[in-house]
Amino acid sequence: ANNFVETVDNSANSYYVVLGLTNPTSPTVGFGRSTTWNTNTPSPEDSFNYMNNAGDTQIFGKKVTSDNIRRLITRRNWAQGTRYEMYRHDYSIANPSPITSSSRLYDASYYVMNKNFNVYVCIDNGSSGISTTGNASQDEPVFTDIEPSRAGESGDGYIWKYLFTVPPSDIIKFDSTEYISVPSDWPTSTTTQIQSVRENGDSTINNNQIKKVYIDQQGFGYTQNQTGKEVDIIGDGTGAKVVIDTDSEGKITKTNVSSGGQGYTYGMVDLGTLGTPSTRAKLIPIIPPSKGHGFDLYKELGTDKLLVYARFDDSTKDFPTDTKFAQISIIKNPTSIGSTATFTTNQFSSVNAIKVISPTGTPTIGEKIEQTVTGGTAKGYIVSYDTDTNVVKYYQDRSLVFNQTTGDQTDYVGVTTNSKMLNFASSADKIIASTSGFTASVDQNFTGISTNPTGNKVISLGVNFESGLASPEINKGSGEIIYLDNRPLITRNSRQKEDIKIILEF
């Protein structure tokens, strides 16, 4: 996940969320299409052929920036009466977490988000070797102090450590019923709250690494009725100490870390000053990640997922509002049309366009259009028709030239001319739609990037036209498709915006 974020931040790269495939059910099935697409949407195929066809049917794309990416963790809302697991560094197959039986920390229920979108890690849940599941949580943590604390006066035994608050802007973009979004720039953020938590978690400065010593076995026969006996935590770090209490039988009943120390990856409690027991105790210093709780948030919470956000609205003619789409993809480093240079602009149109005159009828989105040209017939599928500007947008994919009966490379009559993918021409030959009755002529006299059809308002067309024709802004098939998802067909309109949220797991 971190590597992906870094590559997006790298100015040498350009990532785009792309919408495509206006006609997933017709007029020709095969080539990734299906008559039952909307009721039984197929999964994308993992093949170069499938990806190439998806590239042919792209409509438009919007650039991904670091502002539109967040690391994610599984959402766990605090709920009264729920037992949560405490953070431990040693969950494994041999030592699964006691409530969820997780063999790794990141699957355990060791953090929560409260009603205010504050996120906390559980330092203590009142558990021990004789009560491994701990207590039910009764007090919702709401504090934002940087030191671990109990959340209320119920005596539930919980100690919580505040980590961060999801800001309102991230709630709007990245909120999900399944995931919590994590701040994007934790190691470098100068936001006061984040900086305070991060710096407090640096035990090389604060000598506060270890927060909890877990009583796995109480032992028996240590010095009786000890209160506040401070002993050392020894290991590969330095400076940690814990205060021990014992009962009338010499059992260890309580531990309280008085100095967290620094530099530990393991530790043992030195009980040599508490007498000679008949049964020895087992106390486990819980080792935080990195330098301490809150210092390296991504490591502490296991942020192995990302959410990529993009909003498509009607603010530009690159995103026509009358189109449909059934595929969503992320592509890396498409190249500018007619060039090998990486496309870097905020958005692109990946379809061809025709400025028409004398239209009759209204075309259907997704239907085939044709024009007689030199060498045969140009063909395409309509993506959009703007009645204000008289601009037809279309794409061309291999289904237009393959065998129309078998939907593949089977030989057919007329293959010599019909299998050629020909471009539409700026000529007097009409554009004719296959089913709707729509016809129109190419506006051969139109050149430019804007039009003023009523004489009162200049409308930007998004792409530059030459003699009535416009090319895509990226080279067909350029860029690497790193994510592809099929959806039931979605119809756009001028009153809606599409918020696309893509979850990537690493």
Residue ranges and their predicted role:
Residues 156-506:
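Conserved, function-critical positions that sit in or immediately flank catalytic
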Residues 1-205, 280-282, 371, 376-380, ...:
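Tryptophan-rich substrate-binding surfaces of secreted polymer-degrading and adhesive proteins
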